[in-house]
From Swiss-Prot:
<keyword id="KW-0234">DNA repair</keyword>
<dbReference type="GO" id="GO:0005739">
    <property type="term" value="C:mitochondrion"/>
</dbReference>
<dbReference type="GO" id="GO:0000723">
    <property type="term" value="P:telomere maintenance"/>
</dbReference>
<dbReference type="InterPro" id="IPR010614">
    <property type="entry name" value="RAD3-like_helicase_DEAD"/>
</dbReference>
<comment type="function">
    <text>A probable ATP-dependent DNA helicase implicated in DNA replication, DNA repair and the maintenance of genomic stability. Acts as an anti-recombinase to counteract toxic recombination and limit crossover during meiosis. Regulates meiotic recombination and crossover homeostasis by physically dissociating strand invasion events and thereby promotes noncrossover repair by meiotic synthesis dependent strand annealing (SDSA) as well as disassembly of D loop recombination intermediates. Also plays a role in preserving the stability of 45S rDNA repeats.</text>
</comment>
<feature type="binding site">
    <location>
        <begin position="87"/>
        <end position="94"/>
    </location>
    <ligand>
        <name>ATP</name>
    </ligand>
</feature>
<dbReference type="Pfam" id="PF06733">
    <property type="entry name" value="DEAD_2"/>
</dbReference>
<dbReference type="InterPro" id="IPR036600">
    <property type="entry name" value="PAH_sf"/>
</dbReference>
<keyword id="KW-0347">Helicase</keyword>
<dbReference type="GO" id="GO:0048364">
    <property type="term" value="P:root development"/>
</dbReference>
<feature type="domain" description="Helicase ATP-binding">
    <location>
        <begin position="52"/>
        <end position="355"/>
    </location>
</feature>
<dbReference type="InterPro" id="IPR013020">
    <property type="entry name" value="Rad3/Chl1-like"/>
</dbReference>
<dbReference type="InterPro" id="IPR014013">
    <property type="entry name" value="Helic_SF1/SF2_ATP-bd_DinG/Rad3"/>
</dbReference>
<keyword id="KW-0413">Isomerase</keyword>
<dbReference type="GO" id="GO:0003677">
    <property type="term" value="F:DNA binding"/>
</dbReference>
<keyword id="KW-0378">Hydrolase</keyword>
<feature type="binding site">
    <location>
        <position position="210"/>
    </location>
    <ligand>
        <name>[4Fe-4S] cluster</name>
    </ligand>
</feature>
Amino acid sequence: MGFTVVSRSGSPTRRENQKRRVCFRLLLRLLRRGFVVLSAESDPKMPNYSIRGINVEFPFEAYQSQIIYMDRVIESLQNKCHALLESPTGTGKTLCLLCATLAWRKSLGSFSTRKDRKNSAIPWSDSDEPLSQSGGGGGGAFPTIVYASRTHSQLRQVIKELKRSSYRPKMVVLGSREQLCVNEEVNSLRGKALTNACQYLCKKRGKRQCNHFNRLPDYLKHNPHIGDEPVDIEDLVNIGKDSGPCPYYITRELHKDVDIIFAPYNYLISNGYRKFLKVNWTNSVLIFDEAHNLESLCADSASFDLPSVLLSACISEAQECVQLAAARRDSLNDVSINPENFAILKGLLLKLQELISKVPIPKRDEGFTKPGPYIYEMLKSLNITHETAPKLIGTVEEAAVFLEEEKQRTATNAGSKLEIIADMLKLIFRENGSNHADVYRVHVQELEQNSTDVMKGKVSRTLSWWCFSPGITMLDIAQKGVGSIILTSGTLSPMDSLAQELKLDFPIRLENPHVISSNQLWAGVVSTGPSGYVLNSSYRNRDVPEYKQELGNAIVNFSRVVPEGLLIFFPSYYLMDSCITFWKNGCYRNSMTVWERICKLKKPVIEPKDSSLFPAAMRDFSEKLQDRATSGVVFFAVCRGKVSEGLDFADGAGRAVVITGLPYARVTDPRVKLKREFLDEQSQLADVKLPRSTLLSGSMWYSQEAARAVNQAIGRVIRHRHDYGAIIFCDDRFEQPSQQSKISLWIRPNVKCYSRYGEVISDLARFFRTERSNFPARLVTEQENNIVSTLLPVESIEDNPTPAFGNSNLKNVGVAQNELSRLEAFPPANRASPLERDGNNVKRNGLTILKHTGKIPRIVKGDVMQGCSSRKAKLVELSDDEETPVERRCEVVDLESDNCETQTCVTEVLASSTCLNTMGLKKKRKVPESQGSASSSVLTAKGNGGGDKKEASASAFLSQVKEKLNTEEYKKFIGYMQALKKKEIKLANVMQSIVQLFCGSERDHLLMGFKDFVPVKYRPAYEECIKTRKRQSIIFGNSN
């Protein structure tokens, strides 16, 4: 499908040619950007699916797995029950989740946006009360949806997905002051320092005030539409900078009356943040995206560690408060703050420090452990109880604010450590806190001396109160009367243990398959290396030189056969550093080291342990990946590290992932050891009626945690429907059925165990040869190619590449129409006449730009077909007895380019640039004019003779192809043609790929039509490809 230009009859004048040139330049610009203009009457609606009685609008033709996923979401919402939904990355789960949830919500009543409320039967007027006066609850009687993800980076991607849908609920995204503050006076502060400074400036009685906060009421009054369209953190910050209101307090006011709230996890799992939310929790819907780490996050949010260094800092701050308060009382007669309260606080902290130092620790490795309720005994000896704790917390918070005000006055940016003591006490003495103490353990650990510690020369101890049942957090949430809690991720399995850990009943569960075909994935267990030495990274074997040498040699060979990006995941930083050091320093006479051999094949990048260095490592990876002088990049990373968590290594960024071992947690770690003991105790105390298989023992948890980390790492490859890659398990323990059963469901059927290393390399090489011919390198934008932009954990933007309307979407249509409307802003050199509108078309002096209709009209004899230049142009000639143009090569200079490279004319953009001429559609040599103008056609079907026939027209066939294929499939088709033209793949492989692409009852005419462009001698082979493919479709089912 393309753009068609029709001019009035008669010879064009020079002025008309210049006007046309402007139009063509715009059309070419839009074509290059991928915009297609649709006429208003032909705008197709999004596909509409009726799922459990709910009409769900989906922006694409949904795969069967996506429909099943949306069905489970709606079932959970309708039945007010909880759900565990696993769907591999690249299957479009975020978009499915949004569309299904919002369709269900819309079925209950209109959204709270001005547009929907005006169109609904619910009374609404512009004089609604301000948000600050409205009750929480997402528009009153309707349930509020809270969509939570781990980071704002992930939420940014979710909001992008929302923009792709047709749903426009009233929404808000919540963020911290650090992300939203636009007050230059304080936004350089961090943490509690920024919070206290903000609260101080927003006090009405304060001498200094925040102007952004003061502008908030007027802005909300005159902009009630805010949140009607999807807005992100960056959008809110720009509003604050441009219009003046405080973005942070915009979100605080707005979240009280919206349909859906987007927020990081801590707004739900932290009791303090939950209290901040003014939401009617009754029947609300809570969605946890990327929930594979939810149990550990819940446990961490309910635990604390108090190292002696931090406690000493708090004591120093308390002493500072005593001195400042006494000085203010003496010099200013200010008696509002009593220094004696701060002296009492200091005394209690000193006693706590002494109490911790006297705890008996027989063995440093084991530490001191007591049941959870012991924390109340310790604090009771300091007279800190449920009765006295509130007053003490008030004193701590008063000291922190007082100290912050002083630091503001002296321009000191350091935050107060005392706030941590307040948070610790709130956690211990929270509502019903003692009832939960049984799932805690008190632990005091003696740490090795650190030369940077304030307590240098003294014993450093840490008091910990660890929660071993993350379910207490989820139970607190569920007891608020929420309707449904939906947990989704690409790696939730095994689900039984997850449900048991979270202490909730999840009657709805789903383990979705991937949308890719099985031939797009290679998965194998490599038990031995090139020389036959067993690959096993267990604790006993990991430091053996022979193992490191064998693993290094294996990676060298993988680097040789895996194209582009290769990801290597180690169980720990220790093992990664140990192996790399060995490979660099090994003694090799008259030969290169293992590291040198790896570097010769691929440029290395190593994941840093310091998270602050991670962005630089990603930039390094991106630059090396884009360097065409290299054969690829190898990224050495760690399971549970940043590389394994949510990064998008799509296409060439990650063609294979190597798992070098099982990432078991350190068995001697006190927290791991106590967690295993806790689960074993709980299993023994469990109801004897429960089947033992459903009980989670310590060893089961230990093994499953390692399996989840593996599944997260291998999820970095295969990021969308048309991606392909390999997963290589380099540890013989993966041969065990017990280990393979923990691998994600969609991978398991593909896993093959190899006993000989040579077979691995030959199979891998064959796999990549086949897939590179089946999936030629797709055209990627600069943004897609920049891996640094994917530092954020994201769902691939190509989760579902099957658009409902050709290769465009409504957003692109709007942009293209805006571009057309601005055409008069780009006048030609001789000032052409302004644009005229004729229905859905655009005119300029008789030149008509037709909106896209799905057909390519005939070009009238005498039309000028030219690109960006009027200096070189030729007429498209027509013989007297035909309508089809006889096209000649037009050498056209693009005036927009600096080097004025020659380009094809518009007709070749619509036809020959598709590379169809490489498949039998080729340029014929120039023949004498006496042989007739028809014989001078540049596009002729081989063996068909009738180049003038409509069926053989490249433009007509291209139009049919574009109409039936989705965007990604069409790109593949173009890629095949381009690869064939460059002789990168063989004709036989192209025919097989085309048959696979065109297979399907609705595409049979494409299979037959393409045969016209196949050289005669290859047609029998092409027909055999068709027969073979159809037999496979009958036996195995059509993959398309």
